[in-house]
Amino acid sequence: MSNIYDSANELSRGLRGLPEYKAVKAAKDAIAADAEASKIFTEYLAFQEEIQKLAHTGQMPDASFQAKMEGFGKQIQGNSLLSEFFTKQQQLAIYLSDIEKIVFEPVSELLK
């Protein structure tokens, strides 16, 4: 019987081999090579982190956060590199969601 960690590492290698993973990586590399896209992307990630910190402390984002989010949405839609990255990321997320269901199925069975 194989070690469960070996299986997890094999899954990790399998994910890296997916065309969708490679497409996300290529899109991220393209962002890194473009100064404007890279700046927006970095600012967006910092903003997302700020929202997550608020959520962890039980605070709700105020109206300024909503306005800032809308601004980022417009910037992302207006930049083909960023738009492509997030589209490719959504395609990869389908695999991750399916894998999550498979991995956590035994745990959910224990709770029934």
UniProtKB/Swiss-Prot annotation:
Source species, domain of life: Bacteria
Annotated TM spans: none
Family classification: Belongs to the UPF0342 family.
Name of the molecule in the record: UPF0342 protein SPN23F13380
Organism classification: Bacteria, Bacillati, Bacillota, Bacilli, Lactobacillales
